[in-house]
Design a protein with these regions (language model features):
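Outer-membrane beta-barrel domain signature, strongest for Gram-negative TonB-dependent receptors
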Residues: 1-84, 90-98
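Signature of Gram-negative outer-membrane beta-barrel scaffolds
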Residues: 84-170
């Protein structure tokens, strides 16, 4: 859509929730569950010339939605050896939608006998791009800690992650 006489603005709406539950299975082990949800919606616009003719402007909409779940089991094998094992999952979608009218085409195109609106798209923008990224992550991890002395602790750990991503640019 044309951005002539655009009034710059920025709107942001963010939701972040997190729930952690710790369950002491016994004196030696604790199971922890961490669940989170994140949602961001942002819209903004800027005028490059800040004049009545709308010399140039952009309009951006960003959206992010993510869900994550982690389970951890931590415990002591004995007085000198402890462990941690866990699973992690995340599902995330990002959408970046932006358009730019660099020269105020909607205002000046009729002066040159040109249409101010592209009949194909219905926009007066120089360009318009929607970039969507979907990702899914799965991980398994663990560590073992050995208390060698009162002042020396040795930890070995590993993590395996698998990421799947798809990106589309329109």
């Amino acid at each position: 859509v044309g951005h002539a006489n655009l009034k710059p603005f920025e709107e942001l709406d963010t939701t972040l929730t997190r729930l952690q539950i710790d369950w002491d299975i016994n004196d030696m082990m604790t199971l922890t569950s961490v669940t989170s949800y994140f949602d961001l919606e942002e819209e903004g616009a800027a005028s490059y010339g800040y004049d009545v003719n709308g010399i140039g402007s952009n309009h951006t909409i960003n959206e992010t939605e993510a869900f994550a779940q982690e389970l951890r089991l931590a415990g002591d094998i004995n007085d000198s050896v402890s462990f941690l094992i866990g699973l992690f999952y995340q599902d995330r979608e990002l959408v970046f939608d932006t358009a730019q009218e660099a020269v105020g085409g909607a205002n000046f195109a009729p002066l040159f006998g040109l249409a101010s609106i592209d009949p194909t798209t219905g926009f007066s923008d120089d360009w318009h791009k929607v970039h969507t990224t979907d990702s899914e992550t799965r991980s398994i991890f663990g560590s073992v800690t050995f208390q060698a002395t009162d002042r020396l602790e040795i930890t070995a750990g590993a993590r395996f992650s698998e990421d799947e991503r798809s990106q589309v640019v329109d």
